[in-house]
A protein has these predicted regions:
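HIT superfamily nucleotide-processing domains
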Residues: 1-106
Length: 106
């Protein structure tokens, strides 16, 4: 995701500022599936520290703003580590919505 944040790999961006980038997932799991990432590299939720926690807060501010377009609700997921299903070693939040979502996570 660092290459996407740097503009080296294209993405269908839906939001961008100096700290955060949001773009459509290339393999959507819901009618709306957006990934929200800090532009600065943070490997996973396990790596959040006082030095980078403002980036996480900004990600959630963006999630809240994007969520306004989903008035019937949305889900936010972040996988941390291989057993949780994290396949890209860059902190990211899945914003899922646009229709009924399964109640079960697996």
């Amino acid at each position: 995701f660092c290459k996407i944040a740097a503009g080296e790999i294209p993405a269908q961006k839906v939001y961008e500022d100096e700290l955060v980038l949001a773009f459509r997932d290339i393999q959507p799991q819901a009618p709306v599936h957006i990934l929200v990432i800090p532009k600065r590299h943070v490997e996973s939720a396990a790596c959040i520290t006082p030095d980078n926690s403002a980036l996480v807060a900004r990600c959630f501010e963006v999630i809240a703003e994007l969520g306004k377009a989903l008035p019937d609700g949305f889900r936010v997921v972040s996988n941390c580590g291989p057993h949780a299903g994290q396949t890209v070693p860059h902190l990211h939040f899945h914003l899922l919505g646009g229709g009924p979502l399964a109640l079960e996570m697996a």
